[in-house]
Curated annotation (Swiss-Prot):
Chain positions recorded as Zn(2+) binding sites: 179, 181, 192
Cited PROSITE patterns: MPN, UPF0758
Protein name: UPF0758 protein TTE0897
Family in the record: Belongs to the UPF0758 family.
Coiled coil: none
GO MF assignments: metal ion binding; metallopeptidase activity
Length: 233
């Protein structure tokens, strides 16, 4: 689209308007900015919806800016406001839920890569550490995935009581621990290994086996079991 992006979208040639392009060709042909423009619906007095969308996802920011930003932070951007910010966050959350419902339902875990692939896009851009528990039945199929804590991972924040309460309520046979490193580097810290040790020991007492601890970075993940950081047997 080589037109001046400050002109109103309705003044663009019919075949260049994002909504009409989506109807005719499908969503896969639209740019990220065009898809965002459809979500926010309108621009501002200064710029149209496409120009506004491009400002949101500059090369430095990318799509992860929308994922990581709060409603308030998005709303403070000129031309966005509360209504558009809420639409954007709702779209992100729907995408996250759809991904989990289609990939997680009756999903059998056969390797650490299964968990990494399942949670990578949800967790790779998070600005804080999120500690999750993947709960499995006796056939290693996912029952549920629950966020236990948000913040720097340490033994005071991740308490066995909270971890295994969720697993017991779901009648889980075993669990896999998962958390992200906002730095993008999934290499385990000493604290990561200490948390793992504590939870494995608690699981052995309760009869709920901790199978692994997976750390998500930016585009790659690490299994503490696979890499030999801790003996889960």
């Amino acid at each position: 689209m080589g037109e001046d992006l400050n002109i109103r979208i309705k003044d663009l040639p019919y075949e260049e308007r994002p909504r009409e392009r989506l109807i005719k060709y499908g969503p896969q042909v639209l740019s990220n900015a065009e898809l965002i423009a459809i979500i926010i619906g309108t621009g501002s007095r200064r710029e149209n919806a496409i120009s506004l969308a491009q400002k949101l996802i500059t090369e430095e920011r990318g799509l992860k800016f929308i994922v990581n930003s709060s409603v308030e932070k998005l709303a403070n951007i000129r031309g966005i406001g509360i209504a558009k910010a809420v639409k954007l966050k709702a779209a992100v959350e729907l995408g996250r839920r759809l991904m989990l419902s289609t990939q997680g339902e009756n999903f059998s875990v056969t390797s650490p890569e299964d968990v990494i692939n399942l949670l990578m896009e949800e967790m790779r851009y998070l600005s804080k550490e999120h500690f999750k528990v993947v709960m499995l039945n006796v056939k290693n199929k996912i029952i549920a995935i629950e966020t236990i804590s948000i913040g720097s991972l340490n033994t005071s924040i991740v308490h066995p009581r909270e971890v295994f309460k969720a697993a017991i309520e779901r009648s889980a046979s075993s669990i896999i621990l998962v958390h992200n490193h906002p730095s993008g580097d999934p290499t385990p810290s000493r604290e990561d290994v200490e948390v793992t040790k504590r939870l494995v020991e608690a699981g052995n007492i309760l009869g709920i086996k901790v199978l692994d601890h997976v750390i998500i970075g930016d585009g790659r993940g690490i299994s503490l079991k696979e890499k030999g950081y801790y003996d889960f047997e």
